């Protein structure tokens, strides 16, 4: 068990000045218990905390570190920009054009793209654009899909409160809730029913084609195809939120993997290389409605800043040159098979979901294909599992309902260590 003396001291101090002691809720370890760990350094597939403990990292800054931490080419590019170009100008810069052109080459749906500072900004902007383009107010999202902390997304407007709207967070107005409708993931009939009940009022359907904040739940291809057909028939803008799965499950994202092209796509995480960035883009006829070309307003002081775009551009170049995806698939499949073998030895039958290098071990024997099936997982057992893995030097997400990310720099030795630790942690979780 790692000694966390300094982490505990820092957390107590942080709680005096930062709400809950953290700047993002999941970091507080509330769902697994224990002391949040303060990191001091990252290198490759490893992190070292302020008490000197080292961990094999499967969080990867919640997705961006597909190439690991402190990739030498990436750090060199950022250092060059910092020393020779600058951090921000508030003017157009050439690298904006370079990364926009490259993104449009890589991602099937992109004809034009706008850079922002986070995934939340990207999804908020995409929904505003869809509303402005269509002249309609309502959007459909899916239970269990996370699109950032914009008001429109913090809604549970399905089931018995479908017509009234029920905000999930105080501070979200009833008016906003009324315009956000929740459908069931992987259930096209639930979507059709909502569209029919709100005929001519739905501006957009937004979906994570691989849901990554309810564990990992892949969309069924036939479901995405049916969404595409429904949106075409009803004049609805289809938005793929690929902030998490974009550039990870395939270079061109889930839309390349599934062969289904949305009208708009939101991106983030990997295209920032660990720095704050987001982007949204899609069909030219829609994107041309953004100011200054059109009347839909979107802006940002630091949007397109040189440091973030340098990190993103260099990351994309490395991914294109080195094509890590076959190796990522091999590594993630090795872990999946190893975990399954461990469960077989222990007489367990928990569910594993995986798409490429995104995976989740659910502590349930039920198939997990939507929000309701995901929440059958035993979170108490996951908490025991998490702490056992942590004690063995493996850092996983401190929540049952987050993804495990394999990176290009995880070695075979790292993977074998992880499989061995998994066996011990399964034993600890099921005592």
From Swiss-Prot:
Its EC number is 5.4.3.8. It is an enzyme of class 5 (isomerase). CDD domains: OAT_like. Its main location: cytoplasm. Keywords: Chlorophyll biosynthesis, Cytoplasm, Isomerase, Porphyrin biosynthesis, Pyridoxal phosphate. The keyword Cytoplasm applies. PROSITE patterns: AA_TRANSFER_CLASS_3. One of its GO terms (molecular function) is pyridoxal phosphate binding. GO terms for biological process: chlorophyll biosynthetic process; protoporphyrinogen IX biosynthetic process. One of its GO terms (cellular component) is cytoplasm. Homodimer. This is Glutamate-1-semialdehyde 2,1-aminomutase.
